[in-house]
Amino acid sequence: MNVLPFPCLRPAEDHVIEVLSQPIDTLASAGSILQAQEAGILLKDARPSYYLYENTAANGTCQTALIGICALESLVCDVAQSVEAAPSSACPALQCTPAPVTYKRQPVLDVILSAAQQGAPLYDLYDPARARHRIWHIGRTEAVEAIRTMVQQIPSVSDGSSGVLASMAAHARTARKEAQAAGTYTGREPFNYVLLALYPTDGAKTALPSMPVGFLAHQVAKL
């Protein structure tokens, strides 16, 4: 499984509530993104990085996911079959929330990710349902390379996205056809990659939490 670090587009720490309260159509429009960047409301991290998302429900249940991007074509067959079913549509400028997937727990990766959580989080807030949301940035070269090496050993993932992967695959097909028709397609375009939230599992099926829309975004189209 080749899950990569990426240059994330995310809210400035003092504007996070403002960004999270925006409708998704507003967040994903090119004009709004550019205006928000110029105003310092949205930031784009200079170096490709991984992120950790921790969700603690009001009942104390805590789940943590690694956030990165993955080439759509490299996803395993069970995921690929589900994404092919969606109709094509126009490609948004941003993928504003990651597609949640699960993988078999890797103890060494657990240790690496736990170490990353020892630092101060980028964001730490509660939603109206009293769920706590925390995010850590992993940008140190040594940590990024260690995580990249470990996730390559994950043999497969299972789709828990409830349509996010299907939607992004449909957008990618449309954008790919347009680029091919224009003679500009290279295969390296951002729309060929999907933002994933990878949750470890020990085999038992568990409902996956949803990250608030706009926390971490992957730019999939030119602005």
Language model: regions and residue ranges:
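Surface-exposed, charge/polar-rich loops and edge strands
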Residues: 1-223
